[in-house]
Amino acid sequence: MPVFTIRTNVCRDSVPDTLLSDLTKQLAKATGKPAEYIAIHIVPDQIMSFGDSTDPCAVCSLCSIGKIGGPQNKSYTKLLCDILTKQLNIPANRVYINYYDLNAANVGWNGSTFA
């Protein structure tokens, strides 16, 4: 059930139509979780600054039941920053990604929880 959220000051018109699908496929491969459970949420057109500059930037989060931790997070960060640089022209040094390892009992889906 990984959920990847991107909040960015990049305008909606500059977000490629393929970004959702590309992120889903890459995160499924990286996490080993089925693509059917991966959710992507892109919030463009935000009023943001990073380092006192309003150049393109992003603040992201990846939430998952498991598959979150030190070495994995480094791998995810490289993967996700590469995608954001390639598809949204956001340099990797203008991206923050917060990681959250969720308890299965605290995640609801399809009328129940994952616990």
Swiss-Prot record:
Catalytic activity: 3-phenylpyruvate = enol-phenylpyruvate; L-dopachrome = 5,6-dihydroxyindole-2-carboxylate
Tissue: Ubiquitous. Detected throughout embryogenesis. Detected in adult spleen, liver, kidney, heart, brain, intestine, testis and lung.
Annotated residues for binding of substrate: K33, I65, N98
SUPFAM superfamilies on file: Tautomerase/MIF
GO BP terms, alphabetized: inflammatory response; innate immune response
Function: Pro-inflammatory cytokine. Involved in the innate immune response to bacterial pathogens. The expression of MIF at sites of inflammation suggests a role as mediator in regulating the function of macrophages in host defense. Has phenylpyruvate tautomerase and dopachrome tautomerase activity (in vitro), but the physiological substrate is not known. It is not clear whether the tautomerase activity has any physiological relevance, and whether it is important for cytokine activity. Required for normal neural development during embryogenesis.
Protein name in the entry: Macrophage migration inhibitory factor
Organism: Xenopus laevis (African clawed frog)
